[in-house]
Every structure is written in structure tokens, then in C-alpha cells.
Amino acid sequence: MPPIYRYDHMHLRSRDVKKTAEYYQQMFDAEIVESIQSDGRPRTDLDLNGLTIFIAPVPPEAATPPAPAEPYVGLDHFGLCVDDMDEAVAELKRRGASFTLEPRIIRPGVRIAFVQAPDNVRIELLERGRI
């Protein structure tokens, strides 16, 4: 029998872990949990409705490349399902979110929008089946 693979976590890196964690808490009501990495250094974890996100610090002196220009290869974004796109977008805008793509229908039954999060992370909001 082949192995079974399940999603476990997403791991982000940030120059300002506290600010990044607070963003996810403010925008998406994520719970912030202080943690320790396997190497003993501090890490901040988030619980976003069962989605685990680790945020590890990038030292201020570390050189980091700029965000890639499109097209590029690698992780593009992560997606969050919402029951009501209009309600979610209105609430996120009220909380100060910046949208790179306003809600639009991409095919029958699927509507998307994109939020720009700290550290060049793009978050897709998806509403399925209401349209």
C-alpha cells in the first residue's frame, strides 16, 4: 500500500515575525502561539482555523533576494476558502487588507480575490459553489 500524505504546515520566513504574525491575527483571526524551532531558536506559529503556519525570523543582516518578477517558478500563493466572498472582502478591507485582485468569477461556481500579505506572500480567497 502506498504511503498516505497529509498537509501539515506552511513555513514562512520574515524579517519582522511579530508584525507578520499580528497581520494574520488582525486580518484572519489567526491564533498566535510562541514556539521553538528544532534548532532551539524561537519561532512563532499561527493556527488559522486548523491551518498551521510557522513564521521563522530572518536575521536583519541576512541578504535576501527581491521577490521574483512574473513569470517565475516556485510557490505562487496559498488559498483560503470563504463562504461569502463579499462579506470576507468587506471585512478584510475594513481591517486594512490590500487587494491585488478584486473579486472576480474565474469559471462557473468559483470566485477569487487576492490579498497581499507581508513578506511578498499572496493569499487567494476562494468562494466555491455560490455563483
Predicted ranges, named:
Residues 1-6, 31-79, 90-116, 129-131:
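Vicinal oxygen chelate
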Residues 15, 128:
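Cofactor-binding loop segments of dinucleotide-utilizing enzymes, especially the Rossmann-like FAD-
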Residues 20-25, 92, 120:
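Conserved active-site tyrosine of GNAT-family acetyltransferases
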Residues 125:
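Short glycine-/small-residue motifs
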